[in-house]
Amino acid sequence: MDLYSLGLLDTLRAYREGRATVQDYVASCSQRISALEPRIQAWEWFDPSRAMAEAEERAGGILGDLPLFGIPVGVKDIIATRGIPTRYGSRIFATNVPVTSAWIVRRLEALGGLVMGKTVTTEFAYRQPGKTRNPWNTAFSPGGSSSGSAAAVAAGFVPIAIGTQTLGSVIRPAAFCGVVGYKPSVGAISRTGIHPISTTLDTVGVFARSVADAAWFGACLMGPDPRDDATLVKGPEKILRVPLEPLRAPPRLAVIRTSKWNLAAEPQRANFEASVIRLREAGAQVRDVNLPRLFDDAWENVMTIMSREAVRSFLSIESRHRIRLSPHLIELLDRGHRVTPELYGRARARRDEYRRWLDNLFERNDAIVTIPAVGEAPEGLASTGDASFAQLWTQAGMPAIAIPSGFGPRGLPLGIQIVGRYREDQAALEAAAWTEATLGFKPGLAGG
C-alpha cells in the first residue's frame, strides 16, 4: 500500500505499530504531489525540503503521544503561517510573510502536526477563482473558496486540510472533490490570524477522507481563544468528544429540500432520494420537513450580513487597493456600503429567528439531511459553484458535514449533507458517521 493513501487515524495507527515513520509518510505524500501537482495545482506554496525537515524534527522528538503526531496538514492560504508566504489569494499580498501564525496553526503544531504547505484559496476566500482544478477531471472546478484544501485531500497530497466557510466554502468543494467536509458550529474553532470576511459567518472547517478523521482533527483544533469571543460561548468539550461513539440506534432524520430544490440537477436529486431510501431501510426514522415562508429571504438576508461586515473587514484594503480587487469583491463591498445600520440590525435579528426555528426542529430529530451542492462540479474555472444548499446552515451557525454518496454522469462526485443543532457537533458527527457507514460509498483517491 502507498502510504499517502492512509487517512489521519490510519496514519497514527501505522506510526504506533511501527509500520511507518513520519519521514516515510511525508516522503510518500511529497512524491504524490510531485507526480500530480502540475495538473491539479492545489498548492499556493509547497517546499518539499522544508516538509522533510519538519518530518525529521518530529521523528527526533518526544511527541509520539500527541494526537496529531507526524500528521502533515494542508493550510488554506487565508490563514497566517509564520515564515511562510500568506497571500490570501490576492496579488496585493504577493510578498506577505507573517511573523506570527494563526491560533489554529500554533495549535496543530503544538499537538504534533506539521504544515505541509499552503493550499490555494479564492481571492480573500470570496468568489474570484484560483488556479486549482478538480482532481477527478481537471476540466472542472474543485469548488471554492477552499479549493486547494479539498483537492489536496482528494488527490492524496495530505490526509487532512484546513479550510474556511462563510457561505459554502467547505461543504461545496468537499462535495465536488469527493471528500468529507466538516464545518463546525461557528465559534468552535478560533479564527484569530485568519483574514475575515464576516465575523458572524466565518467558520474554520476541515477536509478529510472519513467522518472519523474529520471529527478527530476538528476536536484537536477546538479550544477557547480570548482573542475570538465566539470561542468562549461554550467549552469545546461540550461540543465534541473523540473518538466518536457508534449510535445505539439509527438516527431520526429530517429531510429538508428547501425552496431552492429546483436548482438541483436531476442526477443530484436522484442520488439524494436513493440515499434517503437506503438510510430509511437501515432503520433511520425519516420524515420530510418543509421550511416555512420565514426562510424565503434567507439568501438576501445572509448577503446583507456578509456584505456589511465585509466593508469593515476590508476597510483598509479597499481604501488603498480598491483598483486591484476583483469585480466580485468590489460588488460585495458596494452592496455592503448600501446596507444601513437599521437594515443590518434587522438581518441579524432574522438570522436569530432562523436559528430558533431550526433549533426547535431538533426536539423531534437528531439531524437534518439534505444535499451539499446543486450537483456535479461546474465545467471550467470561471465559477466555484452555487452555495444555495450550504448558506442557511452557515447563517444559523450550525454544524454541517458533507459526505460522498456517488458519482454523477460526468464521473464527478456527488454528496449528501448532514446538519446538526447549533453547538451540538457531537450528535451531528455521530449521525454523519452512521450515514457514511450505511451508504458505504468510498470514492477512493482522485488523480490516478
Placement of each model-derived feature along the sequence:
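An N-terminal boundary/leader segment
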Residues: 1-50, 281-283, 343, 444-448
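Short helix-loop capping/hinge segments that flank enzyme active sites or metal/cofactor-binding pockets
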Residues: 64, 68-88, 247-256, 304-359, ...
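Glycine/threonine-rich flexible loop motifs
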Residues: 86-95, 265-266, 377-384
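A short helix-breaking turn/cap at a secondary-structure junction
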Residues: 183-270, 438-448
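Short, well-ordered beta-strand elements
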Residues: 206, 412-424, 428-432, 436
